[in-house]
Amino acid sequence: MTTTQVTLIQIDNYGPWTVTPEPRREMDLQSLQSRLFADIAQFMGPRDAYVFSTRYDNMIAVTNGLDGAAHAALQESIGNRYPVSVSLGTGVSERPIDALEAANRLLQTEGSAQDESRTEVLAGDYLTETAPSDLQIAHFDVVNVTGKYTDRLNEFDTFLNIERAYGSLTRYLRESHGALSFFVGGDNVVAVCPDLPEGAFADTVAHVADDVDIELQVGVGRGASAHEAGFAAKHALEACRNDGTSVELSVAPALSD
């Protein structure tokens, strides 16, 4: 059984801030969002957690191993260095989507994301212990993306094909299994999953092929932290690439960096 700790990171009152006292320059906003995500990623990475940019004003992190004090330290650091603050809600559940729902509710019960009086909420449940089977992470990519798309199409049409595959994949995993999937650049998607057998991943790859005619491959890893499970998934994906298989499950967590 998996046990996933998910943290929602929400910029407080961000929409109104972007247009007060007048609309801010778009590239300034994009730079702010990118820097904030990079700083949060640098905070999470050494602690073996993952964070995904999602919509940038709302980021989703897999934080197994991080306690309330670590979350408070992140919140304080952002408040000291940025013109915006963040609220953090954390939930724990077997299915990642249920953990996220719990995290969302914690913030929503405190008020609207655009309520100027609702700032720096810090709430949630945190795992007190971790186990090697707590997390299952799958790393997908497109088979021969360079030969099929990058070297043949213009970049925007390549991007559209990747987006089609991502949309089909993420909806299927969300609706069928309560997994959370995130585009992480290039042709890569990382999915945080409940306890799924190999056949479920084969079915997922087949669904995307049938739905949008794009061939995926996936490596799957387990671990006590997002890094541990994700790194095992990377190694399993390399086995797919080397052996020409569509699904590979890591036998044991990859502990190196």
UniProtKB/Swiss-Prot annotation:
Reactions that this protein is recorded to catalyse: GTP + 3 H2O = 2-amino-5-formylamino-6-(5-phospho-D-ribosylamino)pyrimidin-4(3H)-one + 2 phosphate + 2 H(+)
Similarity section: Belongs to the archaeal-type GTP cyclohydrolase family.
NCBIfam families from the UniProt entry: PRK02240.1 (NF002587)
GO biological process: biosynthetic process
First-tier enzyme category under EC: hydrolase
EC number: 3.5.4.29
Annotated function: Catalyzes the formation of 2-amino-5-formylamino-6-ribofuranosylamino-4(3H)-pyrimidinone ribonucleotide monophosphate and inorganic phosphate from GTP. Also has an independent pyrophosphate phosphohydrolase activity.
Record's protein name: GTP cyclohydrolase III
GTP-binding recorded as keyword: yes
GO molecular function list: GTP binding; GTP cyclohydrolase IIa activity
Keywords assigned: GTP-binding, Hydrolase, Nucleotide-binding
